[in-house]
Amino acid sequence: GKEGWKFNLIGMAERPMMMEYEEGQGKYDWHIDLGPSRLASTRKLGFSLFLNDDYEGGEFQIKTGRENYIPPQQETGNLLFFPSYLVHRVTLVTKGTRSVLVGWVHGNSFS
């Protein structure tokens, strides 16, 4: 938070959501987690808690210019934090079901 990304974090303002991405249809295209609504405008950090790893595909990717960065260790029980303004996606699940708990840590709106 404050030391790494210089964010002044307040806490959780939304309940985390359970997401399931099913084989052949589960994916989430490129997006950011910020938006114009009151809650979405104060999202500073997104997080994903990986609840299983017995699936194929379904990679969490972050857009970094022309390349896509794939954070390592997307394994059961691991927790990934990332700035909410980063463009990211989840690729198509090709086998099994991907289960993840997602949420956001909030702070004052970006200025």
Which positions does each model-derived feature cover?
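Fe(II)/2-oxoglutarate oxygenase catalytic core
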Residues: 1-79, 85-111
